[in-house]
């Protein structure tokens, strides 16, 4: 099978459960995405622990002044993160500080979001993409449950697009791939499943079929 395009979000506060899931699925997914709940419930060392079994994307949605951004990005980098997610609405210098501090860690900037009420961000994706391009990001975060937005963003870039909004937020992994996503983020549909391994396998198969048809 070709490399997975599935990124599993572990939005948990139970470190032991998160590690259990990570160890069970780490080799069959592209990456595991962690967010503030897991880090705040334990410590930043969770990044390195999960990095032993999978790439780790730190979904910190960094959105502060450049100095603070740099501290957060350096910490994630030093802990072994493969990727970091940052907001772009804070402006060029703030986003550039994340890119510069991240070193080889890939920076994905948020240019559109998946939740209801995100119009303020989503209506300005062109400006956010311009800021992101100038800052030198590796890729973008764009919603997999808002296919028209995702398609328009895909038309404007060849960079890697990672898409949330799949499963519990109504999006389908196959539709997101066909609309232009390179990587698909799925969280609750997997970590709340009675069998996360089987759930991840099913989504991997759905993605693989969509890639073949695309």
From Swiss-Prot:
Keywords: Decarboxylase, Lyase, Pyrimidine biosynthesis. The keyword Lyase applies. GO terms for biological process: 'de novo' pyrimidine nucleobase biosynthetic process; 'de novo' UMP biosynthetic process. It comes from the Archaea. One of its GO terms (cellular component) is cytosol. It is an enzyme of class 4 (lyase). Its EC number is 4.1.1.23. Pfam families: OMPdecase. It catalyses: orotidine 5'-phosphate + H(+) = UMP + CO2. The active site is at residue 61. InterPro entries: Aldolase_TIM (IPR013785), OMPdecase (IPR014732), OMPdecase_arc (IPR047595), OMPdeCOase_dom (IPR001754), RibuloseP-bd_barrel (IPR011060). Substrate binds at residues 11, 33, 59-68, 114, 164-174, 187-188. GO terms for molecular function: orotidine-5'-phosphate decarboxylase activity. Pathway: Pyrimidine metabolism; UMP biosynthesis via de novo pathway; UMP from orotate: step 2/2. Homodimer. Belongs to the OMP decarboxylase family. Type 1 subfamily. Catalyzes the decarboxylation of orotidine 5'-monophosphate (OMP) to uridine 5'-monophosphate (UMP). This is Orotidine 5'-phosphate decarboxylase. It comes from Thermoplasma acidophilum (strain ATCC 25905 / DSM 1728 / JCM 9062 / NBRC 15155 / AMRC-C165).
């Amino acid at each position: 099978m070709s490399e997975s395009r599935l990124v599993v979000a572990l939005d948990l506060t139970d470190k032991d459960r998160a590690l259990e899931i990570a160890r069970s699925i780490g080799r069959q997914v592209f990456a595991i995405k962690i967010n503030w709940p897991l880090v705040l419930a334990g410590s930043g060392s969770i990044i390195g622990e999960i990095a032993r079994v999978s790439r780790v994307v730190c979904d910190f949605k960094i959105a502060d002044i450049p100095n603070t951004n740099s501290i957060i990005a350096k910490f994630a980098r030093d802990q072994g993160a493969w990727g970091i997610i940052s907001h772009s609405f804070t402006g060029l210098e703030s986003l550039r500080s994340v890119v510069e501090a991240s070193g080889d860690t890939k920076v994905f900037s948020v240019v559109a979001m998946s939740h209801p009420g995100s119009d303020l961000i989503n209506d300005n994706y062109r400006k956010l993409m311009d800021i992101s391009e100038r800052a030198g990001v590796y890729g973008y975060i764009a919603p997999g449950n808002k296919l028209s937005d995702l398609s328009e963003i895909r038309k404007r870039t060849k960079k890697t697009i990672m898409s949330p909004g799949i499963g519990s937020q109504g999006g389908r992994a196959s539709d997101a791939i066909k609309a232009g996503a390179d990587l698909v983020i799925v969280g609750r549909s997997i970590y709340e499943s009675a069998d996360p391994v089987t759930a991840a396998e099913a989504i991997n198969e759905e993605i693989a079929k969509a890639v073949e048809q695309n």
